[in-house]
A protein has these predicted regions:
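A compositional/biophysical signature of low hydrophobicity enriched in polar/charged and small residues
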Residues: 1-296
Length: 296
């Protein structure tokens, strides 16, 4: 998460005849935990998470040198909504659909707009590129112990406590602190959304005026079919004019497109592009070994 280390979304324009070789170079970095092909001029999109901003930027520079491709670096500036929630046992067409108890625009009691109309906290959280996290030794050990998940046992916290050599109560207190600080977003099952039928996803980038970003981002983050919403910088020197990113996950491509049409017509009347994911090149969890160490 952005409260530990320094991360960025990045992209390259990989020529088709070198696409696989370039993907191999990028995926070879353990600091790269996601890489996707998207149907756009910028056709490889990956995430780099390193122990420091300097190390992150050095990796991007190495990728440029080794691939011969310009890197479009787009670190997160503001988080409006990030929480992938996929229904497993019902027929919902979109992630978060069942959580929408009423229209986002429908006033709550007292006539005031309810920022949690769909059970969603879509407030603006500004992100530092230099976040390091102020971890105790136990918290660092705990993150390393659970980075691949808690043990699937009747006593997962006791098992982890034994692994890190701490009392169970101390582990529970540390987990509470890590959750409160955002180092651990949630504890639960990780759902493979593709297996559950959510095979269509689209990253939509929007040219939203700077003075409207927070208001638009918070409003869109409350929509029940938007799974991610965040602000990233424009890069006009690389012909990248987009500042707001949204993700829509659904079971059918046509339904996803229809929701994006609705998003453009009713909420974001600005220029935009749709970048559909067409291939997963790499997808792993973030590795904490470097992030919890000094330097890196």
């Amino acid at each position: 998460p952005p409260v530990i280390g320094s991360s960025t979304l990045a992209a390259v324009r990989a020529p088709e005849d070198r696409f696989d070789a370039i993907a191999g170079i990028i995926n070879g970095y353990r600091q790269v935990n996601h890489n996707y092909r998207r149907d756009h001029e910028w056709n490889q999109w990956f995430v780099v998470t390193a122990g420091s901003r300097a190390r992150r930027d050095a990796i991007l520079a190495e990728i440029e040198e080794r691939t011969g491709c310009d890197v479009l670096a787009l670190p997160m500036r503001t988080d409006y909504y990030i929480d992938l929630e996929f229904p497993v046992v019902n027929g919902d067409r979109f992630a978060r659909e069942s959580g929408a108890t009423r229209s986002v625009s429908e006033p709550a009691s007292g006539g005031q707009s309810d920022p949690r109309a769909s059970g969603t906290d879509a407030s603006a959280t500004h992100i530092s590129e230099d976040a390091r996290g102020d971890l105790t030794a136990l918290e660092a050990d705990l993150l390393l112990a659970v980075q691949d998940g808690f043990p699937l046992s009747a006593t997962p916290y006791a098992d982890v406590a034994a692994e890190v050599g701490a009392a169970v109560d101390d582990v529970l207190t540390a987990v509470d602190r890590l959750r409160a600080d955002g180092c651990i977003k949630r504890i639960g099952c990780v759902v493979n959304h593709v297996v559950t039928g959510f095979t269509s996803n689209c990253m939509v980038v929007w040219d939203v005026p700077d003075d409207e970003l927070d208001a638009r981002g918070e409003a869109v983050g409350r929509l029940p079919y938007v799974t991610l919403c965040y602000h990233r910088p424009r890069r006009p020197e690389q012909d990248w004019e987009y500042s707001l990113f949204t993700m829509v996950h659904g079971r059918e491509a046509a339904a996803v497109d229809a929701k994006i049409d609705e998003l453009a017509a009713e909420h974001l009347p600005f220029g935009h592009e749709r970048l559909y994911s067409t291939e997963t090149l790499k997808q792993t969890g973030a590795r904490y070994d470097e992030l919890v160490a000094s330097g890196g």
